[in-house]
A protein has these predicted regions:
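Alpha-helical transmembrane segments
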Residues: 18-32, 63-67, 129-142, 189-205, ...
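Helix-loop-helix module between adjacent transmembrane segments
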Residues: 64-73, 101-109, 282-283, 316-322
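Alpha-helical transmembrane segments and their membrane-interface exit regions
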Residues: 3-6, 26-37, 86-88, 138-148, ...
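Membrane-embedded alpha-helical segments and adjacent helix-loop junctions characteristic
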Residues: 10-86, 219-302
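Membrane-interfacial helix-loop connectors
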Residues: 80-93, 117-129, 267-323, 335-337
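Membrane-core helix-loop-helix motifs of multi-pass transport proteins
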Residues: 89-173, 331-362
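Hydrophobic transmembrane alpha-helices of multi-pass small-molecule transporters
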Residues: 1-20, 24-25, 147-249
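Juxtamembrane boundary at the C-terminal end of a transmembrane helix
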Residues: 361-372
Length: 372
């Protein structure tokens, strides 16, 4: 990022220090706001002591649970479920795939994900309803493919089958309420950004629930999180701050090189090529946020359709994370549970091409229905 800004300055283009310092402020605000939800969504004592269910139903409960739970509170959902599914201190292949794939599939549609906020930074005016309608079928496909890969039909699904997490509907009450509030507000006031709405509602809803459940003790817990626990997400926040610096550098570099662009327009074919490049970069070890920042900044002069661009970038994240060995999710799984990061690449080798093909089809379908 610094090198790009220097290249721009040497070519007579002033460095965009404002973009470098504040480019991802709204995204960082969202990550901090969503972190408060952990105070009201952690499993209760009954769930922690409940026997683990088995079989095909347990598999789907776990898949849907990590997907819907993770759609709101992000990566802590994976660790909450994984810690409970440990067997003799180890997390099996099937459980690891269910948790990581089910979580990553949220990125196709969830407005609470950093991926969506990062994409919306480069696509103001995107229509959330269309993005969600495009992403939900892809998320459903991802869950179905995962179930096929992990549900061994030759086993007795009531006995030796998948050992899952005892997920209950009450666990999803707060995330579901937040989804309803955000979507309802966006429908009433579409000019208000999704990131702003989530950043406002997440801590407010958390505070209301804490006061209702615990009274003054809940207020102390809320204040304690604000004063002492927000720093727990510092590595992720630094990553997005660095991405803002990178965006400023790319802007300066483009100005220095005469603004050379990869395409002359941004339609479904260009969107598909962008998606393939993001996933290829992730496979080589580039974090999706860097790829999204690069392409979002690079394509901005084309004034691409914001909805198509946001769908493309979120798909790139949803597929790029399971494709890449160095994603934060896979590195965390290795550090906490001893699963080699390259094992995920091997396990997902057939899964990724199927999702890519479906996503490219979805991009073309969205563009065709909207006359792009």
């Amino acid at each position: 990022g610094v090198a790009g800004m220097l290249a721009g300055v040497l070519s007579g283009v002033p460095a965009d220090l404002r973009l470098a310092a504040t480019g991802n402020q709204t995204l960082i605000g969202l990550l901090c706001a969503v972190s408060f939800l952990r105070l009201v969504t952690m499993p209760d004592a009954q769930t922690r002591s409940e026997a683990l269910p088995r079989g095909r139903t347990a598999l789907w409960r776990t898949l849907l649970g990590v997907h819907l739970f993770g759609a709101v509170i992000n990566i802590p959902a994976v660790f909450i479920l994984a810690d409970r599914l440990l067997r003799n201190g180890r997390l099996g292949r099937r459980a690891a795939l269910v948790l990581t794939r089910g979580f990553c599939a949220c990125t196709f549609w969830s407005p609470f994900f950093a991926a969506m906020a990062a994409a919306l930074n480069f696509a103001p005016g995107a229509r959330l309803g269309i993005i969600i309608l495009t992403g939900l079928p892809l998320a459903a496909l991802a869950l179905w493919l995962t179930a096929l890969d992990t549900d061994d039909g030759r086993r007795d699904t009531r006995g030796a089958g998948f050992v899952g997490y005892p997920m209950h509907l009450r666990t999803l009450a707060v995330p579901g309420t937040l989804v309803g509030l955000v979507l309802g507000t966006h429908l009433l006031w579409p000019q208000t950004g999704i990131t702003t709405i989530v950043t406002l509602y997440a801590p407010l809803l958390c505070l209301v629930v804490l006061l209702g459940r615990r009274g003054r003790a809940g207020l102390h817990a809320f204040a304690g999180h604000a004063l002492r626990r927000l720093g727990d997400g510092a590595p992720e926040l630094v990553l997005f701050l660095a991405a803002g610096l990178l965006a400023a550098g790319i802007t300066g570099l483009l100005a220095a090189t005469g603004g050379q662009l990869p395409f002359v327009r941004f339609g479904p074919i260009e969107a598909s090529l962008t998606l393939l490049l993001i996933v290829a970069a992730a496979f080589a070890g580039v974090h999706p946020v860097i790829a999204i920042t690069t392409f979002g900044t690079w394509l901005a002069p084309l004034a691409p359709d914001p909805t198509l661009l946001t769908s493309t970038l979120t798909m790139g994240w949803a597929i790029g994370v399971p494709a890449g060995p160095l994603s934060g999710l896979h590195l965390s799984m290795q550090g906490r549970y001893g699963i080699p990061v390259f094992a995920f690449q091997r396990w997902n080798s057939r899964y990724i091409p199927k999702l890519l093909a479906a996503s490219i089809l979805a991009l073309h379908l969205q563009a065709a229905l909207r006359g792009l």
